Amino acid sequence: MGIKKEDQKSSLSLLTQRWNNPRIVRVSRAFGGKDRHSKVCTVRGLRDRRIRLSVMTAIQVYDLQERLGLSQPSKVIDWLLEVAKNDVDLLPPLQFPPGFHQLNPNLTGLGESFPGVFDLGRTQREALDLEKRKWVNLDHVFDHIDHHNHFSNSIQSNKLYFPTITSSSSSYHYNLGHLQQSLLDQSGNVTVAFSNNYNNNNLNPPAAETMSSLFPTRYPSFLGGGQLQLFSSTSSQPDHIE
């Protein structure tokens, strides 16, 4: 029982160290990042934690994963680094380039070189690998949230506003940034119309030259009598479509 508590305490300590690791930087789309995946700080600056492999290298990694019976391809890299630990230890430590600490003040406490992962014991590295899987799962959750927010913002920014009867002196509101592309993509199935009800509500129809400038001649069937007529005014469709 005491051993289990010690393991939990050690795992919590490693998790805290990982979240507070100054070499891990999270980039969010909300703050201008192209993607939201975490990046790692290296002697060459921030680098994406995801590494692109050549075709042949990817095949070898997947084959080795099957032969080792590992659950994830990334564990193959961990295994290779573990096997090569003695050779890696013979390499000179990574040195910070001149001016590195000025550009990365949060890393000033690391000394003259980056701390190595191999300085941890095997049990600690295994616990760290467990936390890494949790981190990856958390990344997937944030991916889903970012995708949902991006989709919602896209819908809001691409809304089309058409003539709306708000009072006896109604005005026309247009947001035609993507209208022509929408018409092209949906092959004329867009449910938009300038209703003929303006005759009954003292509304002035848009001028023919205005409509011609908004809709090119590639949609000749859409133009008639100076107004857009995708369906007749007797249709049950509403006048305001969003």
From Swiss-Prot:
Organism placement in taxonomy: Eukaryota, Viridiplantae, Streptophyta, Embryophyta, Tracheophyta
Domain of life: Eukaryota
InterPro entries per the UniProt record, alphabetical: TF_TCP_subgr, Transcription_factor_TCP
The species this protein was found in: Arabidopsis thaliana (Mouse-ear cress)
Domain (TCP) ranges: 33-91
Keywords, sorted A to Z: Developmental protein, DNA-binding, Nucleus, Transcription, Transcription regulation
Gene Ontology annotations of biological process type: leaf development; leaf senescence; regulation of DNA-templated transcription
GO cellular component, one term: nucleus
Protein name: Transcription factor TCP17
Gene name as annotated: TCP17
Main location: nucleus
Tissue-wise expression: Expressed in cotyledons, particularly in the vascular region, in leaves, roots, stems, buds, flowers and siliques.
Molecular function in Gene Ontology: DNA binding; DNA-binding transcription factor activity
Locations listed in the record: Nucleus
Record text on subunit structure and interactions: Interacts with SPL.
Function: Plays a pivotal role in the control of morphogenesis of shoot organs by negatively regulating the expression of boundary-specific genes such as CUC genes, probably through the induction of miRNA (e.g. miR164). Participates in ovule development.
